[in-house]
Amino acid sequence: MSLLTEVETYVLSIVPSGPLKAEIAQRLEDVFAGKNTDLEALMEWLKTRPILSPLTKGILGFVFTLTVPSERGLQRRRFVQNALNGNGDPNNMDKAVKLYRKLKREITFHGAKEVALSYSAGALASCMGLIYNRMGTVTTEVAFGLVCATCEQIADSQHRSHRQMVTTTNPLIRHENRMVLASTTAKAMEQMAGSSEQAAEAMEVASQARQMVQAMRTIGTHPSSSAGLKDDLLENLQAYQKRMGVQMQRFR
């Protein structure tokens, strides 16, 4: 796996699924391929994206700044600086300085990542802030190692939280989660359907599913009534893809 592929993988792992994630993936690909060279416009676009947490925006801004060539005196962006200040915690800043000194001795991406993984996400963000604010310099490879370690820490805690939700025995939370998943699956089906004749069928199934979820929420239904809703939808989607000559079995 190439270095940039690895960076893209880690960064995208902390972005919530949805149309915005696809858009960010495209921007990262363009930036890494050298196709997008207007850092100012890129940062302005990032700043105004909804849904993303300030820290995720800060990490993306840091990655864009590392990758896109820019004039020497280009102003640092406040939204990135604020996100990478470790919540203003002096403890994070002390650890960030110690980590920075260790990173100065590293020359490889993997070496930097290994060193960084023993620190908390707050200290890692502060260390990125030091580098972003030009208070310290490391090689791009080492900076990317720091980015990936930070993303791994964040993704780990997101995964723990997600696992808690998936394994919860609370029927109301499970019911709502199934309805949310069915609704987002239906939305994805509508986006994929396009305008062919068979597409009308897929659109109809998706539309009915969304109406059903809406009705279930409006009138309040038994928690078990949503069981299998998403799987039914995915079966419909796969049947539609088969007719279109597309074989994708890994949606589940």
UniProtKB/Swiss-Prot annotation:
It is a peripheral membrane protein. The gene is M. It is found in: Virion membrane; Host nucleus. Residues 165-252 are annotated as: RNP-binding. Most abundant protein in virion. When expressed alone can form virus-like particles in transfected cells. Keywords: Host nucleus, Membrane, RNA-binding, Viral matrix protein, Virion. Plays critical roles in virus replication, from virus entry and uncoating to assembly and budding of the virus particle. M1 binding to ribonucleocapsids (RNPs) in nucleus seems to inhibit viral transcription. Interaction of viral NEP with M1-RNP is thought to promote nuclear export of the complex, which is targeted to the virion assembly site at the apical plasma membrane in polarized epithelial cells. Interactions with NA and HA may bring M1, a non-raft-associated protein, into lipid rafts. Forms a continuous shell on the inner side of the lipid bilayer in virion, where it binds the RNP. Homodimer and homomultimer. Interacts with NEP. Binds ribonucleocapsid by both interacting with genomic RNA and NP protein. May interact with HA and NA. Cannot bind NP without genomic RNA. This is Matrix protein 1. Pfam families: Flu_M1, Flu_M1_C. The lineage of its organism: Viruses, Riboviria, Orthornavirae, Negarnaviricota, Polyploviricotina. It comes from Influenza A virus (strain A/Swine/Tennessee/24/1977 H1N1). Its main location: virion. InterPro entries: Flu_matrix_M1, Flu_matrix_M1_C, Flu_matrix_M1_N, Flu_matrix_M1_N_sub1, Flu_matrix_M1_N_sub2, INFV_M1. GO terms for biological process: viral budding from plasma membrane. Residues 1-164 are annotated as: Membrane-binding. It comes from the Viruses. Belongs to the influenza viruses Matrix protein M1 family. HAMAP family: INFV_M1 (MF_04068).
